[in-house]
């Protein structure tokens, strides 16, 4: 049971971090200079539905931008909406409470504080439904800081035993699902072929600084695929995530779950990926 809770602690932490980043990028884009980019709005709408930030019945951002925005903001703290930021944050707290003895006091305090601050009662105009994008962004930025700190605790402050490997596997499964889906939708909608959509994709992969350090002002698909798909030194790239999953599963298969070694072998080996094939 502890192993299962560690696995879900990893998944909920990664999922919360991902949907928080997506919500921030969406609100920033809807209120920035690029709000007229139709491919970007189409991608943001598709991602919002895909990641559960808005319901499928909500009009797309390109059709009714403010309705889409208000729906996203209203859903952030809905714990009954099973894909909301708030629900996933409560999921972290629930899984962590079941493995409290495996976590440092600082790690536990971070989780409790993040949940308390995110669900803190709104006051004044906020209670009347007038919760502005700026207010929501501040709320999301605070949570982003907390989830980044949780990631640090899980990465550097836990013993790397089989329980930790399950937590890590949970995180990387979630990361692979979210990022591969984002890239697929970016290609389907054509958003990555426009400057605003290109930058939003790199930001969702949390790779903006790395990208501009390596490629300066380039915005071509070869550079995008190289960093976000192929780069096995970038912990946000698909290759790094798959490579790490293979290693974690193989190690787990040596000790407690022989079938996991077989799962690891079934995952594609990033060492065999070819940039020329993937970027065509």
What are these regions (language model features)?
Residues 1-280:
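Alpha-helical transmembrane segments and their helix-helix packing motifs
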């Amino acid at each position: 049971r502890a192993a299962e809770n560690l696995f879900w602690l990893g998944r909920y932490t990664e999922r919360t971090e991902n949907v928080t980043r997506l919500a921030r990028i969406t609100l920033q884009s809807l209120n920035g200079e690029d709000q007229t980019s139709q491919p970007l709005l189409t991608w943001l709408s598709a991602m919002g539905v895909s990641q559960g930030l808005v319901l499928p019945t909500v009009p797309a951002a390109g059709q009714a931008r403010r309705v889409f925005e208000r729906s996203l903001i209203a859903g952030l703290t809905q714990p009954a909406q099973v894909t909301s930021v708030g629900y996933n944050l409560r999921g972290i707290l629930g899984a962590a409470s079941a493995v409290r003895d495996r976590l440092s006091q600082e790690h536990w305090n971070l989780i409790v504080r993040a949940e308390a601050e995110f669900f803190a009662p709104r006051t004044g105009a906020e209670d009347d439904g007038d919760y502005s994008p700026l207010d929501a962004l501040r709320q999301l930025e605070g949570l982003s800081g907390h989830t980044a700190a949780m990631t640090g605790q899980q990465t550097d402050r836990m013993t790397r035993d089989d329980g930790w490997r399950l937590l890590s596997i949970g995180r990387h499964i979630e990361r692979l699902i979210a990022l591969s889906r984002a890239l697929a939708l970016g290609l389907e909608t054509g958003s990555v072929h426009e400057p605003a959509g290109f930058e939003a994709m790199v930001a969702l992969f949390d790779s903006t600084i790395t990208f501009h350090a390596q490629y300066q002002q380039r915005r071509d698909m070869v550079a995008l695929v190289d960093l976000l798909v192929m780069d096995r030194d970038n912990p946000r790239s698909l290759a790094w995530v798959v490579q790490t999953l293979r290693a974690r599963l193989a190690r787990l298969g040596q000790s407690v779950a022989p079938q996991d070694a077989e799962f690891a072998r079934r995952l594609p080996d990033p060492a065999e990926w070819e940039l020329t094939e993937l970027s065509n």
